[in-house]
Amino acid sequence: MGSQVAEVRQTRNAERTRRAVLDAATAVILEKGSAVTLAQVASAAGVSKSGLIHHFGNRDQLVLAVVEDVYEQFRARVLEHLDLSENYPGKLLRAYVRALGAGSTEAVAVRDLTSAVSWNGLYTIPAVAALVDEQNAEWSKQFAADGLSAERIQVVRRAAEGVAAAAVIGDEDAESIATAVGLLLDLATDGTFRSPL
């Protein structure tokens, strides 16, 4: 019994350490961009560099884990914004727009991931580039099954991502984001705006 308790405790500690490293790595990457080092992440996470390597192996594996984590968090946020009472085409696309327009930490993280210049150098890592392509393809596939035309999906999706990118660099305030989200939700509903522009 004592060894089982110790094993559970050790697993929890490993999970906490992993979470701390992922959170710290995200913050350091946003600050340092592709020049991020394992030493910087280890310092920010409060772990030794050897401890970080134990969990992630090397820098590329850490970066890949960060990107995977941010995508998982964002997918969860999109699903939280899914309105099950909307029984008409575009339900998932509207949830995507709401999630990108939300102010949650996870939404901001994915806006940073998908939009911030500081991440661009990370896409040179083959596994990261493949994951980004895979995620884009998966979103496209799910949106295509959502009942709207491909053209409408493209316009709404890319506009929402653009608004999110502008928010990251400070070009949009909360009011303008809310206005844009409202217009995009209208466009993802029946293709028309409720009020004149």
Q: Where are the predicted features?
A:
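Amphipathic, non-transmembrane alpha-helical scaffold segments
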Residues: A14, V67, Y71, A129-N136
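Alpha-helical DNA-contacting segments of helix-turn-helix folds
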Residues: V63-V70, R77
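Generic transmembrane alpha-helix motif of multi-pass integral membrane proteins
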Residues: S115-L122
